[in-house]
Each structure stands twice: as C-alpha cells, then as structure tokens.
Amino acid sequence: MARPPPPDTPARRRKQAAHARGLAAEDRAAAVLEAQSFRILARRLRTSAGELDLVARRDDLLVFCEVKLRRSLAEAAESLQLRQRRRIIAAAELFLADHPELAPLAMRFDAILLGRDGGAEHLEGAFELEG
C-alpha cells in the first residue's frame, strides 16, 4: 500500500525551493565547465562518504567540483569548510575505486561559487588532497 504524500507545510515548501535552487546552480556550474571544454561525467553523485556535485573531464584532467550558491560570492567562498573538503575527497576516492580507468588521470578539486545576483567564479584547485 502506497504512503500518502507528506503534508504541504511551509518547511516542506522551503526545502523544495532550496532543492530547485541547488539543481539550477549545478546546471549553471556545469555550463561554466562545459564552456571550458570539460565533459560532465557525473552530477549529484551520491557515495557512502557524501555527494559529489560535479565530476568532469577534459583531456587527461579529472575535476571534482563543489558548487556553492549563496547570496554573494564572498559568502559562497566562506561556506566551503574543512570538514566538507574532507568529505569531498573521501567521495572522490570512492568514485575512483569504482572507476579505476580514470585513476591515472591528473586530478583537481575545484569549486564554482555562485551568487544569487548572477555572479560566478571558478576556483581551480580550490583545495588539495591534504585539505
């Protein structure tokens, strides 16, 4: 027997709106990478360590990209904390374990910062493995 849908509450509507903003932000970030000749290999990839927003490849370079949308680019930059960087690195390691053919590629951890005002900044090498 199917469960009835959850009640429509203000909290649920906020969560749905945040989810939609996140998807739109990831679309914008993917477009930034594609404009730089990257091919998107994965979006919102869930692993046991956490989620990878975007995984992209250009030639012999594999990029794990975190997307941050905030009111301003400065707020977006501040939101990428050490704990999250470690989670992204762990998720990337799991991704590579599942895709050993990509392991020989050069690897980089980027961030694409997006402001709600439309601003965007691509931080290449935003953090390192030691992160």
Swiss-Prot record:
Coiled coil: none annotated. GO terms for molecular function: nucleic acid binding. Transmembrane segments: none annotated. InterPro entries: Restrct_endonuc-II-like, tRNA_endonuc-like_dom_sf, UPF0102_YraN-like. Gene3D superfamilies: 3.40.1350.10. It holds the Pfam family UPF0102. Belongs to the UPF0102 family. NCBIfam families: PRK12497.1-5. HAMAP family: UPF0102. This is UPF0102 protein AZC_4471. It comes from Azorhizobium caulinodans (strain ATCC 43989 / DSM 5975 / JCM 20966 / LMG 6465 / NBRC 14845 / NCIMB 13405 / ORS 571).
